[in-house]
Design a protein with these regions (language model features):
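C-terminal "cap" of GNAT-fold acetyltransferases
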Residues: 114, 136-154
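Conserved acetyl-CoA-binding loop-helix of GNAT-fold acetyltransferases
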Residues: 81, 87-100
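A conserved beta-turn-beta hairpin within the catalytic core of GNAT-like acetyltransferases
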Residues: 67-76, 86, 105-109, 139-141
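Short amphipathic alpha-helix that is part of the acyltransferase structural core
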Residues: 1-58, 154
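Conserved beta-strand in the GNAT
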Residues: 50, 57-67, 73-80
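Conserved GNAT acetyl-CoA-binding A-motif
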Residues: 95, 102-115
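Conserved active-site alpha-helix within GNAT-family acetyltransferase domains
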Residues: 117-134, 138-141
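A short beta-turn/loop motif at secondary-structure boundaries
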Residues: 39-44, 68, 136-138
């Protein structure tokens, strides 16, 4: 699936993009995974990456919270793909694009995530390494993982 990426700070998203992102996040995080508050104060201190299909329908999004808000490093979170976009590599495209955007904004910085535990292998395939024991967040098992950018040989 080819996606057109939008990368913007919260204040620059525009009401339609913000609505699209929150609607998709609510559909997955609240309706599919059980009720908890999704929008939080970190949204305003984040970049948001949105992937739209050819018809202009949001299929995937994530946010990158600024360093110093949740962790010392920038942190990727609220990673979500629409149900109809799953199983075709959309999630892989989303995370890869998110890591690339992190390196554009914070070159050479590590990236931290609080991953749902069942996705540890998925994130591990990008080079994320577990740095905590499993814990519950919103009644869902999670694990902290850290990605360190590859060293570029000069």
């Amino acid at each position: 699936m080819a996606l057109k990426w939008t990368w913007a700070r919260f204040d620059d998203l525009g009401v339609h993009a913000l609505h699209d992102a929150l609607a998709l996040r609510c559909k997955v995080f609240i309706l599919e995974q059980g009720p908890y508050q999704d929008p939080d104060g970190a949204d305003k201190q984040s970049y948001h990456l949105l992937g739209y299909d050819e018809a202009g329908v949001l299929q995937a999004c994530l946010r990158v919270v600024d360093p110093g808000v949740n962790y010392p490093e920038p942190s990727i979170g609220r990673v979500v793909t629409a149900k109809e976009a799953r199983g075709n590599g959309t999630g892989r495209l989303l995370v890869a694009e998110g890591l690339a955007r992190c390196q554009q904004v914070w070159p050479g910085r590590a990236v931290r995530i609080s991953a749902q535990a069942h996705l540890q292998r998925f994130y591990g395939s990008f080079g994320f390494v577990a740095v905590s024991d499993e814990y519950l967040e919103d009644d869902i098992p999670h694990i902290e993982m850290l990605w360190t950018p590859p060293v570029v040989q000069g």
